[in-house]
């Protein structure tokens, strides 16, 4: 029998031997923007009911006040702070996403894990940047050479995020290759999440678990806790379990690691709209029609949006009664684009969803399950028929915020300001922006954390 490709060992050695100087300027710049964007999303997350429940839970189970829960004066142990911060980062689904390899929403978990642990260890900004880049690199290497785990009912965000969080924390703790392998083995057994949970509080709970899982795995491994040393590639291991036996390309997983880093190319996407990424093309097409033709909703007879079968199954909701459900319902997103001409945080509140005008608008949207569009939906046709018989249509192909149609650095910073102002003062906001933009020069990441504590 052929000897298995040593994926776990190779990746662990790469992480242990990685040098900050080998990470390109573009990768580092992108890393900073994704970290900043995630912190902004997390600060908005503080205002949600999901967060309120999580904060109370942390008070009940967390008795070691060593790490800060962002946007609050509350502290917890590093694993529990990572849990809370991971949840905050994904609470409103306004954090980054992967547009190419079904890697979910990586940054919320990796940043929550590494910044929560980094606060305890007194890590530098350079150490945090390196650890973050490595966490993203390894989880995307796995995802790029495996099938879509969501086709098997798992949620890719926590499955892969657990790996990324553990790698980032292992880097921060400067673990040896053997201990990194142990951390991977530990985190693999804590990974998981069911895709059906989108549109519920459990979706950000998945990110919370992955961040906590990564911190715990690295801390246990640091102290000598052992695990299977070939967990990624071994029979009945991580890849077999989540992706299916024989479905992963292990040779490709260990080819050209960091050449370039995924953060440089192809890169992660940043969210222009505060809803789930699969709705972005429909949103962009609808907003184009609204603005280009100055559509008055009173003149609209019906709206049609075509999506492929799997997207129809996952992102059409016959009934939308909560803002959270609306984030994942393509018919709601399209209705709001044509009705209001914009998507804002307030678009996805229970109060907004249940307005009579909004519910009436929903009835005008017909979502068509179109088998001629390939999965997962690389383009999205939207048509608006007016009461006078005029038919207007537009097809969006690359969403705003996709790495191929990126947000500018100024747009990312303005998005952060808009989010952060809900929780912290302007002076703190600007201090945090400056710290992240020059993260290599930050001597202790406590500086970043302190800027997120409300005055």
Residue ranges and their predicted role:
Residues 118-217, 228-235:
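Glycine-rich, mobile lid/loop segments that gate access to catalytic sites or pores
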Residues 108-116, 160, 164-168, 213, ...:
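Short amphipathic alpha-helical face segments that pack within enzyme cores
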Residues 1-103, 199-213, 219-455:
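Terminal-appendage/accessory-domain detector
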Residues 86-143:
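Hydrophobic alpha-helical hairpins/lids featuring a short glycine-rich hinge
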């Amino acid at each position: 029998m052929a000897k298995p490709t040593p994926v776990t060992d190779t990746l662990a050695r790469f992480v242990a031997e990685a040098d900050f100087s080998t990470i390109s300027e573009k990768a580092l710049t992108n890393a900073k923007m994704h970290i900043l964007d995630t912190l902004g999303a997390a600060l908005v997350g503080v205002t949600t009911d999901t967060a309120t429940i999580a904060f109370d839970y942390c008070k009940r189970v967390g008795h070691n006040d060593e790490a800060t829960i962002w946007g609050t004066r509350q502290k917890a142990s590093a694993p529990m702070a990572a849990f809370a911060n991971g949840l905050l980062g994904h609470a409103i689904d306004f954090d980054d996403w992967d547009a190419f390899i079904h890697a979910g929403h990586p940054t919320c978990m990796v940043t929550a894990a590494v910044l929560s642990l980094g606060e305890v260890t007194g890590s530098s900004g350079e150490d945090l940047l390196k650890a973050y880049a490595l966490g993203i690199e390894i989880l995307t290497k796995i995802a790029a050479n495996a099938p879509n785990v969501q086709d098997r009912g798992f949620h890719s965000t926590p499955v892969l995020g657990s790996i990324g969080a553990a790698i980032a924390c292992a880097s921060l703790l400067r673990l040896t290759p053997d201990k990194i392998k142990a951390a991977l083995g530990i985190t693999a057994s804590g990974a998981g999440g069911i895709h059906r949970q989108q549109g519920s509080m459990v979706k950000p709970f998945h990110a919370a678990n992955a961040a906590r899982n990564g911190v715990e795995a690295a801390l246990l491994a640091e102290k000598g806790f052992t695990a299977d040393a070939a967990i990624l590639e071994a029979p009945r291991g991580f890849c077999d379990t989540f992706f299916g036996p024989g479905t992963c390309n292990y040779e490709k997983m260990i080819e050209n690691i960091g050449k370039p880093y995924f953060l440089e190319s192809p890169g992660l996407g940043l969210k222009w709209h505060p809803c789930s990424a699969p709705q972005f093309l429909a949103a962009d097409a609808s907003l184009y029609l609204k603005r280009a033709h100055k559509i008055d909703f009173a003149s609209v007879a019906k709206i049609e949006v075509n999506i492929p079968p799997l997207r129809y199954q996952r992102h059409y909701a016959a009934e939308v009664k909560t803002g959270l459900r609306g984030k994942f319902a393509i018919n709601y997103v399209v209705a709001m684009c044509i009705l209001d001409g914009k998507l804002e945080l307030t678009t996805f509140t229970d109060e907004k969803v249940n307005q009579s005008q909004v519910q009436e608008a929903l009835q005008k949207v017909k979502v068509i399950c179109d088998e001629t569009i390939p999965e997962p939906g690389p383009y999205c046709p939207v048509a608006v028929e007016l009461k006078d018989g005029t038919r207007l249509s537009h097809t969006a192909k690359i969403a705003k915020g996709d790495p191929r149609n990126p947000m500018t650095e100024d747009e990312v910073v303005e998005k952060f300001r808009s989010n952060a102002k809900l929780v912290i003062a302007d002076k703190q906001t600007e201090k945090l922006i400056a710290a992240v933009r020059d993260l290599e020069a930050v001597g202790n990441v406590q500086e970043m954390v302190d800027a997120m504590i409300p005055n």
